[in-house]
């Protein structure tokens, strides 16, 4: 069955809309994958263990903290700057405090500057991997374990980096279901062990 002019145009337009919707849907996971693989935009890498090689060359890591508008916590790095050898495992802490009278959940987003160093900044353990819930008046120390990959000295764009800034921004998120039930005093359906 042959399509006439208007029918052919409608089929082409529907095809374009479906194609654009598919590309829009696929762009978010593709961009996330691209940033993790290339370190684009200061996205860091995740490592299972520390580096096998430690160089004599040192690098400074600055720690920065901010909060999204409306996030009621106090949030700051315990140590503002740390100098370590490239490849050496570092341990830094951030402090968070919930001054409110209610539990507050948060999720940290992170970035590394300059962007060229993001690919070489490896986190072994980080509070940013999981959502955090602070009870009213609770103060916690949150660790991040990391190292700078020795391969940074081979990269023509990153080898002259002497200082890396690790920035975290905390965003308020909805309380997990078990915490929400405890907050309202309704224990029906609340888990006995909260993660």
UniProtKB/Swiss-Prot annotation:
Family annotation (SUPFAM superfamilies): Ctag/Cox11
Stretches in topological domain Cytoplasmic: 1-9
GO BP: respiratory chain complex IV assembly
Recorded superkingdom: Bacteria
Primary localization class, coarse: membrane
Regions of this protein lying in the Periplasmic compartment: 31-195
Family named by the database record: Belongs to the COX11/CtaG family.
Membrane topology: Single-pass type II membrane protein
Protein name per the record: Cytochrome c oxidase assembly protein CtaG
Cell inner membrane keyword on record: yes
Functional summary from the UniProt entry: Exerts its effect at some terminal stage of cytochrome c oxidase synthesis, probably by being involved in the insertion of the copper B into subunit I.
Keyword Ion transport: no
GO CC term (a single one): plasma membrane
Keywords: Cell inner membrane, Cell membrane, Copper, Membrane, Signal-anchor, Transmembrane, Transmembrane helix
One Pfam family, short name: CtaG_Cox11
């Amino acid at each position: 069955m042959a399509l006439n002019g208007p029918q052919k145009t409608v089929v082409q337009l529907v095809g374009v809309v479906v194609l654009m919707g598919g590309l829009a849907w696929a762009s978010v996971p593709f961009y996330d994958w691209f940033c993790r693989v290339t370190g684009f935009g200061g996205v860091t890498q995740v490592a299972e263990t520390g580096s096998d090689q430690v160089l004599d060359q040192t690098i400074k890591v600055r720690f920065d903290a901010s909060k999204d508008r409306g996030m009621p916590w106090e949030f700051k790095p315990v140590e503002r700057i740390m100098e370590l050898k490239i490849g050496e495992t570092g341990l830094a802490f951030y402090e968070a405090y919930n001054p409110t009278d209610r539990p507050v959940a948060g999720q940290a987003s992170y970035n590394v500057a300059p962007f060229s160093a993001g690919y070489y900044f490896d986190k072994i353990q980080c509070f940013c991997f999981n959502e955090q819930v602070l009870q009213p008046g609770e103060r916690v120390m949150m660790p991040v374990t990391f190292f700078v990959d020795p391969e940074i000295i081979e990269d023509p764009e990153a080898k002259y980096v002497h200082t890396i800034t690790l920035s975290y921004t905390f965003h308020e998120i909805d309380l997990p279901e078990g915490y929400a039930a405890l907050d309202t005093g309704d224990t029906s359906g609340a888990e006995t062990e909260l993660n």
